[in-house]
Curated annotation (Swiss-Prot):
Protein name, entry field: FERM domain-containing protein 4A
Gene for this chain: Frmd4a
Lineage: Eukaryota, Metazoa, Chordata, Craniata, Vertebrata
Biased composition, class Polar residues, residue ranges: 542-551, 626-658, 967-981, 994-1004, 1011-1020
Start-end of Basic and acidic residues biased regions: 893-910
Subcellular locations according to the entry: Cytoplasm, Cytoskeleton; Cell junction, Adherens junction; Cell junction, Tight junction
Annotated function: Scaffolding protein that regulates epithelial cell polarity by connecting ARF6 activation with the PAR3 complex. Plays a redundant role with FRMD4B in epithelial polarization. May regulate MAPT secretion by activating ARF6-signaling.
Length: 1020
């Protein structure tokens, strides 16, 4: 079956569509393809059927694949029929004329195939309307008799009831003569009016038997289910309207319906089941029973949809309007796709999986086409009006020119056959221009070309001059560059000489721009040699000094690397080149001595700005006394201390980077390294290098971003030292169980480089004592992660409900389908599910919530949440027998109240999120205070302590954010700002303990404090 199967679809206009159906093609897609051949919009009334082995029509289920249906086991292509599946009261409710035409063709086909029982006299009258629609008015008896043999007008049963064919033809001719003057549309409308009045119209008949084996006809329509005598399809014996039915189900050879009968009284109190419910059962082969069940469900859904949409249905059109429209449109229009592929009565379709060409055309409505045509017509009129105005303006301009010159221009617009107007020249318009004052066009273009060449050559000369003045090159290369510079000057002088010649010819003064460039080049070469000597002296003084973040008013403004976004644009003129040359002295050399490489003078504009004052050295040394560590940091090269240089060391031969351990028995101070201004892309790559694992609470490395006074970036990294197992910080290693740590960089913060110092031993011991006092609140596995939502046993239970999905899955042979059920007084439909397999199935007609063990409304009954009290039994959803669904089961918790399971989980999540948000707000306030109070040594140590504690805990924040966003409800997640989700954890040790355990602390001033209005609104 992988190569597909050939199918032949019989259309209502006697055409046949042949196509190769692919295995994955759905029945809905096949219906779209067939409908596209009629440009059909209202496809909901139609379906595709096939004749099964019992001789009954079996309809394709639109949500299943075509080849999954049980087709007859015959050779050759599968025969399918496109016809009407759902009927309505009148064609006046149909919107499109094509739909009315197809209903007419379907009615003719059903009567001719004897699917509808019709009296013989009615058949003769209907045949006359068919002749009037196809052939027009009556002409002669012979023509009518020949037409009746060609048209499908007289069914076989009507011919059998009468002695001869001539009698039947005479009766048709009598009716046909009375229809003279009727249009085609009127004939169709009158035909459908008669057919719609028939009691058997719109009913699908199925042959069944009852328990005694008596044969019956079971009729299904949009009105309900009817039971007919086997020899009489007109008058039903039993009528079951859809509003009376409760449930529909089948099992193998049995089809049953539960009918609500209010007149039926209960016999005794011991009666099982409902007293007002009567069950009716019919029997047939399993394939036919399943087909009846599927048709009953589809008819009930169509009944509900029409009942729900009656208020939205537009006013029905009158039959006279429909007749006029049908007459004007003519015969049924087929699509271009059908005409292209048709050969006589057979349409050769392509692969059934290619549906886009037809479905797009069928989806466009007639009203949309009319609107498009109206818009195009209005656009055409606007363009024609604009063209007329432009032509009038052109005529006026041409006439004015003709009055001045005495000759009508050739651009004057003339209509076909129109003679050009005669225009007289005005008096006094003749004059003569001075030819000497007009510059020839060739000389003007030559001067412009020379000016462009001079601008380009001046930039080339300036670049050659800068290369020639570079002192860090060899003598040979310097000589070559000097020669190139002299040649560029010579060419520049030649271009200027040519420009001056042209300027003298045009009466302008000559220029001397090339000589100025030569003089500037000589002065610049002398200045560059002097500035290089000054830079070398300045390098010696800078390398031996220890630099702090407060030395420069720029607070460590880094030398900008020659990147694309920091490089200044090239000068566009000679003045820009001269200004750039004069500004070169504002930059200073890098403090690094060139060792393996040397900087050229071309890099000078990208180096850091000269220091404006040197008094920052003494102030910084007073504020931070020099120690051994300071001296070591100052003497070593700043580039080697930079985190960029040390990255390969961190990622050396191991997937787990080294853990920075912090000593607490030596004084610690802040040392600055050489800052590097990096782009956001480079910052993200650095963040990947800084990811590492840690087993100690205090040694969690984190890149903290903070804003300093001038807005310059500072990047904080912990200094790595040898670890000591006896450090007090290591005692908290049992409180954490992180396998990895993520780093978060807020978008509004600038990440900066600087070395983060450790705390003093007294501060560490103080924090250790605080942790020991709050050790009872610490859990072995909580440590800042999501709160545990599992139910707690014993006295520690908080009453939070637990949603545990059971692992029971519906069997693979069952198919669960959902249908919308509209309940009286409800605006939104209730989802009703039907359970279907090859052997049995169930469908609820009314979605009533019951608690009985019988077949209920699609399994949609429920029991309320019950509290187990002291026994510890929790409420449980009782599954229905009618369906197999995954239902939530509750944990065994005795502290529940009724209906408190979902509320407890939501309340616990809400409290945890509010605690973390409040802690973040207090931490932001403390961080801001500590960052602004850095003028004294004591204040700076306080800031370092708070920042360090926050630094050791902040690595867990991204995991908290991910868990929070996953656990919160969708409405609360959508209304939570991203800045609050990605917040930094609290900075004080007390808040860290609260953060780790996820429990509220009674004496915390923040837990009693502000609760964000946004979160309050979302919680409610």
């Amino acid at each position: 079956m992988t190569e597909g199967r050939r199918c032949q679809v019989h259309l209502l206009d006697d055409r046949k569509l042949e196509l190769l159906v692919q295995p994955k093609l759905l029945a809905k897609e096949l219906l779209d393809l067939v409908a596209s051949h009629f440009n059909l919009k209202e496809k909901e009334y139609f379906g595709i059927a096939f004749t099964d082995e019992t001789g009954h029509l079996n309809w394709l289920q639109l949500d299943r694949r075509v080849l999954e249906h049980d087709f007859p086991k015959k050779s050759g292509p599968v025969v399918l029929y496109f016809c009407v599946r759902f009927y309505i009261e009148s064609i006046s409710y149909l919107k499109d004329n094509a739909t009315i035409e197809l209903f007419f063709l379907n009615a003719k086909s059903c009567i001719y195939k004897e699917l509808i029982d019709v009296d013989s006299e009615v058949v003769f009258e209907l045949a006359s309307y068919i002749l009037q629609e196809a052939k027009g008015d009556f002409s002669s008896n012979e023509v009518v008799r020949s037409d009746l043999k060609k048209l499908p007008a007289l069914p076989t049963q009507a011919l059998k009831e009468h002695p001869s064919l001539a009698y039947c033809e005479d009766r048709v001719i009598e009716y046909y003569k009375k229809l003279n003057g009727q249009t085609r549309g009127q004939a169709i409308v009158n035909y459908m009016s008669i057919v719609e009045s028939l009691p058997t119209y719109g009913v699908h008949y199925y042959a069944v038997k009852d328990k005694q084996g008596i044969p019956w006809w079971l009729g299904l329509s949009y009105k309900g289910i009817f039971q007919y005598d086997y020899h009489d399809k007109v008058k039903p014996r039993k009528i079951f309207q859809w509003r009376q039915l409760e449930n529909l189900y089948f099992r193998e050879k049995k089809f049953s319906v539960e009918v609500h009968d209010p007149r039926r009284a209960s016999v005794t109190r011991r009666t099982f089941g409902h007293s007002g419910i009567a069950v009716h059962t019919w029997y047939a082969c399993p394939a036919l029973i399943k087909s009846i069940w599927a048709m009953a469900i589809s008819q009930h859904q169509f009944y509900l949809d029409r009942k729900q949409s009656k208020s939205k249905i537009h006013a029905a059109r009158s039959l006279s309007e429909i007749a006029i429209d049908l007459t004007e449109t003519g015969t049924l229009k087929t699509s271009k796709l059908a005409n292209m592929g048709s050969k006589g009565k057979i349409i050769s379709g392509s692969s059934g999986s290619l549906l886009s060409s037809g479905s797009q055309e069928s989806d466009s409505s007639q009203s949309a086409k009319k609107d498009m045509l109206a818009a195009l017509k209005s656009r055409q009129e606007a363009l024609e009006e604009t063209l007329r105005q432009r032509l009038e303006e052109l005529k006026r301009l041409c006439l004015r020119e003709a009055e001045l010159t005495g000759k009508l221009p050739v651009e004057y617009p003339l209509d076909p056959g129109e003679e050009p107007p005669i225009v007289r020249r005005r008096i006094g318009t003749a004059f003569k221009l001075d030819e000497q004052k007009i510059l020839p066009k060739g000389e003007e273009a030559e001067l412009e070309r020379l000016e462009r060449e001079f601008a380009i050559q001046s930039q080339i000369t300036e670049a050659a001059r800068r290369l020639a003045s570079d002192p860090n090159v060899s003598k040979k290369l310097k000589k070559q560059r000097k020669t190139s510079y002299l040649n560029a000057l010579k060419k520049l002088q030649e271009i200027e000489n040519a420009i001056n010649e042209n300027r003298i010819k045009s009466g302008k003064k000559p220029t001397q721009r090339a000589s100025l460039v030569i003089d500037d080049g000589n002065i610049a070469s002398e200045d560059s040699s002097l500035s290089d000597a000054l830079v070398l002296e300045d390098e010696d003084s800078q390398v031996t000094s220890t630099i702090s973040p407060l030395q420069s008013p720029h607070k460590g403004l880094p030398p900008r690397p020659p990147s694309s976004h920091n490089r200044p644009p090239p000068p566009q003129s000679l003045e820009g080149l001269r200004q750039l040359h004069y500004h070169r002295t504002d930059y200073d050399k890098s403090p690094l001595k060139p060792k393996m490489w040397s900087e050229s003078s071309l890099d000078e504009p990208y180096e850091k700005v000269k220091k404006r004052s040197s008094h920052g050295h003494s102030s910084s040394h007073k504020r931070f006394p020099s120690t051994g560590s300071c001296t070591e940091a100052g003497v070593s090269s700043s580039l080697q201390n930079s985190p960029i240089r040390s990255l390969p060391h961190w990622n050396s031969q191991s997937s787990m980077p080294s853990t920075p351990d912090l000593r607490v028995r030596s004084p610690h101070y802040v040392h600055s390294t050489r800052s590097v201004d990096i782009s956001p892309t480079r910052l993200h790559s650095l963040a990947l290098h800084f990811r590492h694992r840690s087993s100690s609470l205090e040694s969690q490395g984190k890149l903290l971003g903070s804003e300093n006074d001038t807005g310059s970036p500072d990047f904080y990294t912990p200094r790595t030292r040898s670890s000591n197992g006896s450090d007090p910080m290591d005692d908290c290693s049992s409180c954490t169980s992180h396998s990895s740590s993520e780093h978060y960089y807020p978008a509004q913060m600038n990440a900066n480089y600087s070395t983060l110092a450790e705390d003093s031993p007294s501060k560490a011991r103080q924090r250790q004592r605080q942790r020991q006092r709050a050790a009872g609140a610490l859990g072995s596995a909580s440590s800042g992660s999501m709160p545990n939502l599992a139910a707690r046993s014993g006295a520690a239970s908080t009453g939070g409900g637990v949603y545990l999905h059971s692992q029971s899955q519906p069997s693979s042979q069952y198919r669960i389908k959902e249908y919308p059920l509209y309940i009286e007084g409800s605006a939104t439909p209730v989802v009703v599910r039907s359970l279907e397999s090859d052997q049995e199935g169930h469908y609820s007609v009314k979605a009533q919530f019951k608690t009985s063990n019988s077949y209920t409304a699609g399994g949609l009954f429920k029991e309320s949440w019950r509290g187990g009290g002291d026994e510890g039994d929790a409420g449980r959803l009782t599954p229905s027998r009618s369906q197999i669904l995954r239902t939530p089961s509750l944990g065994r918790d005795g502290a529940h109240d009724k209906g408190s399971g979902r509320a407890a989980v939501s309340d616990e999540l809400r409290q945890w999120y509010q605690r973390s948000t409040a802690s973040h707000k207090e931490h932001s306030r403390l961080s801001h205070t500590s960052s602004t109070s850095s003028d004294s040594g004591s204040q700076y140590s306080t800031s370092s302590q708070s920042t360090f504690v926050a630094h050791s805990r902040v690595t867990r924040m991204p995991q908290m954010c991910k868990a929070t966003s996953a656990a919160l409800p969708q409405s609360q997640r959508s209304s939570t700002p991203s800045s609050e989700i990605g917040a930094t954890p609290p900075s004080s040790p007390h808040h860290i303990l609260t953060w780790q355990t996820g429990e509220a602390t009674e004496n915390s001033p923040i837990m009693d404090g502000s609760e964000s209005p946004t979160h309050q609104s979302t919680d409610e």
